[in-house]
Amino acid sequence: MGASLKKIEKSVATLELTIPKEKFEEGLDYAFKKNASKFNVPGFRKGKAPRFLVERYYGEGVLYEDAIEYVFHEAYQEALKTFNLEPVDYPDINILQIGKGKDLVLEATVAVMPEVELGEYKGIEIEKIEYDVYDGDVEYELEKLRQQNARIIPVEGRPAEQGDIAVIDFEGYIDDKPFEGGKGENYELELGSNTFVPGFEDQIISHNVGETFDVTVTFPEDYRVEELKGKTAVFKVTLKALNKKELPELDDEFAKDVSEFETLEELKQDIRKKLEEKNKREAENEMKEKAVMKVVENAKVDIPDVMVERQIDLSLRDLDYNLRLQGLDLNTYLSITGKTIQDLRKEMWEGALNRVKTQLVIDKIAKVENIEATEEELENKLKELAESYRVNLEEFKKSLTESQINGIKEDIAYYKTIDFIFNQCKIVSKEE
């Protein structure tokens, strides 16, 4: 069998495959045996007519499709190996020559893994990013701790006020008709939290426990549910109970209760230290992201559309999964947003293209620099994953396929390569 690479243009390869007539004859014989029981030739019981009569009665081409399928795979795989091509899609096949007693000549056009031409990726200059920790940041974290450790106590002898936690039953009506999602029972609503539609919480203030009253609101024009945008609704609300938070004093006793520290000052110092570490990580991640963006911009690569389309498919699958966690699905989301699946794919195109290019460039650098996951790194990652899933390490290992383990190795190498790029960067201060 012979093959020639006619051209590669924008990561799409065109191969010409020549299958010797003897091999094609073998394919025709295979196709006849496979389909013999389907042929009904006059003068013969169904499936009993010889091949030459079947071809005469139905036409020679009746066996071509299965014969081509029989011979194509071997010839195609040989050609890919010969020209060192890695396909990223199924090939389109065009018949250039076919017939009994002739070599079969096929043209296969397929998108292949693109060549990456790296630009500068060592010594990239990036601006230093730093985030300071202010006293207000520490106070904010302390206030969160107070809120988390607040006691909830009942309110008696007064109407609802801002900051109270109202326990309510409610049902909403538009044009005197109830609507989906407009009903709730024993719902705990913190007044002033802006959890509900604007104006709803304000109209509970000044009411007493046991009262039933109307709350009238207008849904914003940008409300997430299409059917409710701009609509006026009347809610029948019953205030069943009223509670409030009793916040602990910020003192040494509070520090002892919520931490391992003896004094409030020690707790503050610990909060500051953790915030500084968090800010340092975030700043470093931002600098890494900027470095990778520059490296990707410096590289040249022709990405076949099919790779972008597949990335979009993955993004849509992730979106649908996340929507289902919220009780929705992709079709409902499209209905709410007034978009079509084509609109969504178009919006996702640029982001998907950038993700594919980034992956290709990082993979190329990893290959050039011989960056791989070590056995120790793999073992540590498997331990980390097993702990996160709360399963036994050995059982977790046994549950993984070879493909999944290779995927974990690739992830490790990917992030090691990003660290490599970052460690090679020249970090300059804004003043410079």
From Swiss-Prot:
Primary localisation category: cytoplasm
Reaction catalyzed: [protein]-peptidylproline (omega=180) = [protein]-peptidylproline (omega=0)
InterPro entries: PPIase_dom_sf (IPR046357), PPIase_FKBP_dom (IPR001179), Trig_fac (IPR005215), Trigger_fac_C (IPR008880), Trigger_fac_C_sf (IPR037041), Trigger_fac_ribosome-bd_bac (IPR008881), Trigger_fac_ribosome-bd_sf (IPR036611), Trigger_fact/SurA_dom_sf (IPR027304)
PPIase FKBP-type domain: residues covered: 163-248
GO molecular function, one term: peptidyl-prolyl cis-trans isomerase activity
Signal peptide boundaries: none
GO biological process: 'de novo' cotranslational protein folding; cell division; chaperone-mediated protein folding; protein transport; protein unfolding
GO cellular component labels: cytoplasm
NCBIfam families given in the database record: tig
Entry protein name: Trigger factor
Organism (species): Caldanaerobacter subterraneus subsp. tengcongensis (strain DSM 15242 / JCM 11007 / NBRC 100824 / MB4)
